[in-house]
Amino acid sequence: MAMASATATLSFKTPSLSLSPPSTRCSAAQGISLTHFNKQLKSTLNLSSSSSISSSKVQPIVLKNKRISTVDSSVSTSSPSFTVFAAKGYKMKTHKASAKRFRVTGKGKIVRRRAGKQHLLAKKNTKRKNRLSKLIQVDRSDYDNVIGALPYLKVNRKV
């Protein structure tokens, strides 16, 4: 039985802003015109699951024809990016009857008991009963079925 899982990745880049020297002062009477800035910003922002928010064409904020802040292009290219991972997967359930029948050795092999040692033991000789008591390795062709029933089994397929 196969279960579905999905992974979403979002990446955000934060540009660093450097302010110009405080040679220009802003008073409460002066107004800031942001209409051109907002239109330019809306047209340059892109957001999707595979790309990051980018605003490379941002114009500086203008105060009545006076520049007070600019975007430093050399610093913004080396700005840190923050990545958010959202992974959703379903827990696989262990098949409890299979968990009682199979074991994993220290090297990662799947082993099982031999059949035929539950009843009618009086007619079986001692040598046969001893042989049936030992564990044997599961065939490689059955590994997929056992691992499907026991998803959290630590199996080494290369051994």
Curated annotation (Swiss-Prot):
Which protein, by its recorded name, is this? Large ribosomal subunit protein bL35c
Localisation per UniProt entry: Plastid, Chloroplast
Gene name in the database record: RPL35
Query: What does the UniProt record say this protein does?
Result: Component of the chloroplast ribosome (chloro-ribosome), a dedicated translation machinery responsible for the synthesis of chloroplast genome-encoded proteins, including proteins of the transcription and translation machinery and components of the photosynthetic apparatus.
Which Gene Ontology molecular function entries are recorded, alphabetically? structural constituent of ribosome
Which GO BP terms, alphabetically? translation
| Pfam (any one) | Ribosomal_L35p
- Cite the residue span of the transit peptide: 1-86
**Which protein family is named in the record?**
Belongs to the bacterial ribosomal protein bL35 family.
The record's listing under InterPro entries reads: Ribosomal_bL35 (IPR001706), Ribosomal_bL35-like (IPR021137), Ribosomal_bL35_CS (IPR018265), Ribosomal_bL35_sf (IPR037229)
Gene3D superfamilies per record? 4.10.410.60
Source species of the chain: Spinacia oleracea (Spinach)
PANTHER family under this entry? Answer: 54S RIBOSOMAL PROTEIN BL35M, LARGE RIBOSOMAL SUBUNIT PROTEIN BL35M
